């Protein structure tokens, strides 16, 4: 199985590293526009093999998409962060151009690949990749919910003082600090609702911490996080390549699900060899429905900036 990761920065390289040492794919290609950068990252990862015991072939390439041919999954991490003085529309315009070009190039060489979008604003870039390429909706997946849910489980773990892997919890909605919806009502520890252990006040703080989880790390690190994002992408890729059919919150195209249409937004999905195998219909209460509708409106508003690109 072959995975291409476009963008050899911190998130892309971490994703390649995790995929390699976990043996998720037999081959990983890192591609970047910066001369020699992906090659260096790939060589560094390969030199871990004797210490970590993996056999994955990792290679790097500078902007040569022919080397990505035959990829089962392509991960797009390319894009720029928002800079001081830059409007939301300007950021979307620049990153949309990058994502569109990358998606078109990889599809020339891997027409049946499944594309995982990581670039921000993630829901809008996922929608752009879908609309610009015409790829079937099950093969375009935005990663955001996997990361947001991981952060939610981590904060619940800290509040409960219990292992995160014993906690089930999910975040739906847009991948943004005002649009995501941590489903505290449905979170559980070894099958027992966390509401049995944590007060409403604590749960509200956990939800709030989750929503600003990315911003918190940016404040501490001085740049965006990369370990958890890279691992979240690898987790998603693993479910695709090995047909694990895990339930993962992902940004996908909805057509009536949860009362929404013509947007990509985070919803619970079954992820397998065909990409999005199924969108699960979780019964939301009235408050959660209202929050989801508000989140969808915000995502739709972001998508408006794509109109000039998608004509």
UniProtKB/Swiss-Prot annotation:
InterPro entries reported in the protein's UniProt record: L-lactate/malate_DH (IPR001557), Lactate/malate_DH_C (IPR022383), Lactate/malate_DH_N (IPR001236), Lactate_DH/Glyco_Ohase_4_C (IPR015955), Malate_DH_type3 (IPR011275), NAD(P)-bd_dom_sf (IPR036291)
Protein name per its UniProtKB record: Malate dehydrogenase
Protein's GO biological process: lactate metabolic process; tricarboxylic acid cycle
Keyword match Isomerase: no
Subunit structure as annotated in this protein's UniProt entry: Homotetramer.
Reported temperature dependence: Optimum temperature is 40 degrees Celsius.
Homology family: Belongs to the LDH/MDH superfamily. MDH type 3 family.
Gene3D superfamilies tied to this protein: Lactate dehydrogenase/glycoside hydrolase, family 4, C-terminal, NAD(P)-binding Rossmann-like Domain
Known catalytic reactions: (S)-malate + NAD(+) = oxaloacetate + NADH + H(+)
Function: Catalyzes the reversible oxidation of malate to oxaloacetate. Can use both NAD and NADP for malate oxidation, but NADPH cannot be used for oxaloacetate reduction.
Top-rank taxon, per record: Bacteria
EC number: 1.1.1.37
NCBIfam families according to UniProt: MalateDH_bact, PRK06223.1
Pfam family name, one: Ldh_1_N
Amino acids binding NAD(+): 7-12, 32, 95, 118-120
pH dependence remark: Optimum pH is 10.5 for malate oxidation and 8.0 for oxaloacetate reduction.
Binding residues annotated for substrate, in chain numbering: 82, 88, 120, 151
HAMAP family: Malate_dehydrog_3 (MF_00487)
Sorted UniProt keywords: NAD, Oxidoreductase, Tricarboxylic acid cycle
Any one GO MF annotation of this record: L-malate dehydrogenase (NAD+) activity
Regulation: Strongly inhibited by iodoacetic acid and CuCl(2). Completely inhibited by N-ethylmaleimide and HgCl(2).
Active-site residues (renumbered): 175
Class of the enzyme per the UniProt entry, highest EC level: oxidoreductase
């Amino acid at each position: 199985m072959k995975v291409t990761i476009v963008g050899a920065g911190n998130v892309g390289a971490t994703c390649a590293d995790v995929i390699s040492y976990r043996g998720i794919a037999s081959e990983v290609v890192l591609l970047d526009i910066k001369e020699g950068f992906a090659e260096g990252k790939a060589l560094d990862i390969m030199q871990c093999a004797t210490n970590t015991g993996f056999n994955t072939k990792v290679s790097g390439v500078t902007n040569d998409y022919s080397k990505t041919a035959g990829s089962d999954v392509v991960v797009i991490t390319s894009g720029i962060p928002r800079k001081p003085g830059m409007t939301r529309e300007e950021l979307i315009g620049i990153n949309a151009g990058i994502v569109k070009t990358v998606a078109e190039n990889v599809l020339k060489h891997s027409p049946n690949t499944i594309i995982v979008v990581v670039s921000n604003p993630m829901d809008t870039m996922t929608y752009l990749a879908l609309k610009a390429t015409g790829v079937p909706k099950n093969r375009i997946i935005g990663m955001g919910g996997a990361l947001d849910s991981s952060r939610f489980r981590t904060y619940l773990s800290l509040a409960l003082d219990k292992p995160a892997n014993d906690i089930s919890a999910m975040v739906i909605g847009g991948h943004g600090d005002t649009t995501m919806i941590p489903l505290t009502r449905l979170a559980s520890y070894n099958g027992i609702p966390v509401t049995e252990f944590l007060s409403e006040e604590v749960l509200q703080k956990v939800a709030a911490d989750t929503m600003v989880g990315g911003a918190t790390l940016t404040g501490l690190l001085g740049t965006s996080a990369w370990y958890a994002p890279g691992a979240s992408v690898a987790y998603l890729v693993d479910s695709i390549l090995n047909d694990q059919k895990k339930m993962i919150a992902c940004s996908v195209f909805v057509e009536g699900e949860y009362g929404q249409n013509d947007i990509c937004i985070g919803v619970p999905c079954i992820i397998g060899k065909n990409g999005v195998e199924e969108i699960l219909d979780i019964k939301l209460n009235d408050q959660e429905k209202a929050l989801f509708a508000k989140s969808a409106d915000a995502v739709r508003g972001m998508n408006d900036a794509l109109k000039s690109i998608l004509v």
